[in-house]
């Protein structure tokens, strides 16, 4: 067991030791800066529980992910303070990478502020994020590491940022994006060609973040800041399939899964997304 981790719930998948894995799953259960609907700290365990409902065989790829070398490293025991949580998450991710630097890491959240630690450790050149929100505030509710600021903090690392499925933001965020060369696509304007046009020129490796609020609301009612008018499941899958075939991926995360009951539609959607991400990465 890693220094700061614990096992919350076993997935419906056989797992291997971290050192032997091709894919490593790590939960980041934190919702300390949530501004509307708390519960994202339960996201990792809810996703794992939802895997009980799913077949491990991916029809689309003729791949059974139960036959792959997957390690579940557990969940990181994160402090309540966002600054302290970031420090512990960074230290734990570094420990995982020291054991196995070649495996593809997949992080389960947890609010979107928890995307910052993986990006800090993995140092990608580009950040592709599916999100209903721009998350480009400089500060929110007294913190520069609030979930509403994560894309801005990542941009400040010198990482190229591209945001898809947006339908919420402030005038200041839109102006900052324009002035800073940050590309984003409104959910109303999103299509596969728009995604390809923007992502084709991004430098590698790419870190991919999926805030589940990017999906249309009936799919993901249990999330921290829900918004109507989102993308469909297959729209996101199609984009990820293209990206994983053509770009080197540094890591993935699935963030902002919330709720307080087993089998809610948000956690099932996220678990299915997790299985597809693993399957498409193994093609």
UniProtKB/Swiss-Prot annotation:
Subunit: Homotetramer.
NCBIfam families for this protein: agmatinase
Temperature impact on function: Optimum temperature is 100 degrees Celsius.
EC number: 3.5.3.11
Database matches in SUPFAM superfamilies: Arginase/deacetylase
Entry's family note: Belongs to the arginase family. Agmatinase subfamily.
Stored PANTHER family: ARGINASE/AGMATINASE (PTHR11358), GUANIDINO ACID HYDROLASE, MITOCHONDRIAL (PTHR11358:SF26)
Inhibition and activation profile: Inhibited by putrescine. Activity is not affected by arginine and ornithine.
Assigned keywords, A-Z: Hydrolase, Metal-binding, Putrescine biosynthesis
pH dependence: Optimum pH is 11.0.
Protein name: Agmatinase
GO biological process: putrescine biosynthetic process from arginine, via agmatine
Catalyses which reaction(s): agmatine + H2O = urea + putrescine
């Amino acid at each position: 067991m890693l220094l700061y981790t614990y096992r919350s719930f076993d997935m419906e998948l056989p797992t291997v030791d971290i050192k032997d894995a091709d894919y490593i799953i790590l939960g980041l259960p934190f919702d300390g800066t949530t501004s509307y609907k708390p519960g994202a700290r339960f996201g990792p365990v809810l996703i794992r529980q939802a895997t009980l409902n799913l077949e491990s065989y991916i029809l689309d790829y003729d791949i059974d992910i139960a036959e792959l070398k997957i390690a579940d490293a557990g969940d990181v025991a994160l402090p309540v303070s966002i600054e302290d949580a970031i420090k512990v998450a960074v230290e734990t991710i570094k420990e995982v990478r020291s054991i196995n630097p070649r495996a593809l890491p997949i992080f389960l959240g947890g609010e979107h502020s928890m995307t910052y630690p993986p990006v800090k450790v993995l140092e990608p050149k580009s950040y592709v994020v599916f999100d209903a929100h721009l998350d480009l505030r400089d500060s929110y509710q007294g913190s520069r590491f609030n979930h509403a600021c994560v894309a801005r903090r990542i941009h400040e690392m010198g990482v190229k940022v591209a945001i898809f499925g947006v339908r919420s933001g402030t005038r200041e965020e839109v102006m900052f994006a324009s002035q800073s060369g940050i590309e984003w696509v409104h959910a109303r304007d999103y299509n596969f060609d728009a995604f390809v046009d923007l992502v084709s020129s991004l430098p590698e490796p790419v870190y991919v973040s999926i805030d589940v609020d990017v999906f249309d609301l009936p799919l993901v009612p249990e999330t921290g800041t829900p918004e109507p008018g989102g993308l469909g499941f297959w729209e996101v899958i199609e984009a990820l399939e293209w990206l994983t075939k053509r770009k080197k991926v540094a890591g993935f995360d699935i963030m902002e899964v919330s709720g307080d009951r087993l089998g809610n539609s948000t956690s099932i959607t996220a678990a299915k997304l997790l299985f597809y991400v693993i399957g498409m990465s193994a093609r």
